[in-house]
Amino acid sequence: MTRPTHPNALIWLLLSIAIIALDQATKAWVLTSLPEYIPVPVIHGFWNWYRSYNTGAAFSFLSDAGGWQMWLFIALALGISGLLTFWLSRTPRREWRSALPYALIIGGGIGNVIDRFLHGHVVDFIQWYVGSYYWPSFNLADSAIVAGAIGIGLLSLFDSKHSPKTP
């Protein structure tokens, strides 16, 4: 006797592929259209296009470590993406609250891995600022990773399956 199979959430990898494609398309535009390290205002006083490069991780962590960090970040991104893909294969398709953040993180992580393989660094181009305070430059892959991490955090806070039961 076989048990009924339920569709898993691997279909959400289509979102990951879309994020990778959009991320790489925007970075191709940046590399052919924006000058290096010169702000191009989008919204004065808040947002610039600003082509820059990051050999490190978030907030340029380990960016001056000498090159070995590229392989560390590639291994981490591929390992985490592999784990999240495995989790998607075990997640029922209807559980979009789990599948969506996993797909976002996978797409963003692989988008930045492609940069590291192609260029030896990640291409950043979105710069937000207020007055003299500048947030570190980032890209669409970074945005997907952050949105996915926030989604996982919110899910863990508000998921009714894991909340204490009241008598």
From Swiss-Prot:
Report the active site residues.
124, 142
Q: What is its main location?
A: membrane
Read off the InterPro entries from this record: Peptidase_A8
E.C. number(s) listed in UniProt: 3.4.23.36
Q: Where are the transmembrane segments?
A: 10-30, 68-88, 98-118, 138-158
Q: In which pathway does it act?
A: Protein modification; lipoprotein biosynthesis (signal peptide cleavage)
Please give the catalytic activity noted in the UniProt record: Release of signal peptides from bacterial membrane prolipoproteins. Hydrolyzes -Xaa-Yaa-Zaa-|-(S,diacylglyceryl)Cys-, in which Xaa is hydrophobic (preferably Leu), and Yaa (Ala or Ser) and Zaa (Gly or Ala) have small, neutral side chains
- How is this protein situated with respect to the membrane? Multi-pass membrane protein
| Top-level lineage group | Bacteria
Q: Which PROSITE patterns match?
A: SPASE_II
Q: Which UniProt keywords apply?
A: Aspartyl protease, Cell inner membrane, Cell membrane, Hydrolase, Membrane, Protease, Transmembrane, Transmembrane helix
GO CC term (a single one): plasma membrane
The subcellular location is: Cell inner membrane
> Which terms does the UniProt entry file under GO BP?
proteolysis
**What GO MF annotations does this protein's record show?**
aspartic-type endopeptidase activity
PANTHER family from the xrefs? LIPOPROTEIN SIGNAL PEPTIDASE (PTHR33695:SF1)
Q: What does this protein do?
A: This protein specifically catalyzes the removal of signal peptides from prolipoproteins.
Family listed:
Belongs to the peptidase A8 family.
What is the protein's given name?
Answer: Lipoprotein signal peptidase
Say which species the protein is native to: Xylella fastidiosa (strain Temecula1 / ATCC 700964)
- Gene name, please? lspA
